[in-house]
């Protein structure tokens, strides 16, 4: 597969239902099952590849997930209703009470507020650091550390994270390096630099027109 994100997305062939050059838009909230046994298998997690309810997936969001996974060169992607929806679901999937996060002090305000004001209620502690000083991060790593969180280029201060240096700290540990790549899609590929998970607010650079809200987790 090409190392160029644009080429990887361009090579994704997904046409409309009747051969349209663009994928069809799915505007249904629920989907038909011709056999009750199929629905039961989907509910019980025994069968994949079927759409159940558009809050989870539908053909349109599945195509978007494929394109974003191609762009970030990850195995899969999952879209959310907003950037913060993607960020919070990712963090809460990895961390639980008693865990600790090391995060950049210059991250997006909504993310900072979630880490600082909401996670302590769940017993999750965040250490905010100068992400450019890896010695600070190494000093804070302990047995409770579950995540190092940063932005490739911070919003809005444009501080640059050294992802390979951060990956050298988390490599061969259970700590996940989570990178918000909102400001630099198609320019930087965090996965190829050592990140474990990549997040985007689709509302910003990828949308580009300020007329839609969305988020994605790529891993």
Spans of model-derived segments:
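N-terminal "arm"/small-domain region of PLP-dependent enzymes with the aminotransferase-like
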Residues: 1-58, 66
């Amino acid at each position: 597969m090409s190392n160029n994100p644009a080429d990887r997305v361009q090579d994704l062939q997904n046409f409309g239902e009747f051969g349209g050059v663009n994928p069809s838009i799915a505007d249904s909230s629920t989907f038909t099952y011709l056999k009750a046994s199929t629905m039961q298998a989907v509910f019980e997690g025994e069968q994949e590849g079927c759409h159940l309810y558009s809050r989870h997936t539908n053909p349109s969001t599945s195509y978007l997930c494929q394109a974003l996974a191609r762009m970030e060169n990850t195995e899969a992607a999952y879209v959310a209703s907003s950037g913060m929806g993607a960020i919070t679901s990712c963090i809460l999937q990895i961390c639980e009470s008693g865990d600790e996060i090391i995060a950049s002090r210059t991250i997006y305000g909504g993310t900072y507020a979630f880490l600082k004001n909401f996670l302590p209620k769940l017993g999750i502690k965040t250490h905010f650091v100068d992400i450019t000083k890896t010695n600070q991060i190494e000093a804070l790593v302990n047995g409770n550390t579950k995540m190092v969180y940063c932005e490739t280029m911070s919003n809005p201060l444009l501080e640059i994270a050294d992802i390979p240096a951060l990956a050298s700290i988390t490599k061969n540990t259970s700590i996940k390096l989570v990178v918000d790549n909102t400001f630099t899609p198609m320019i930087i590929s965090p996965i190829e630099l050592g990140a474990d998970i990549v997040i985007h607010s689709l509302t910003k650079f990828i949308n580009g027109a300020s007329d839609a809200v969305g988020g994605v987790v790529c891993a």
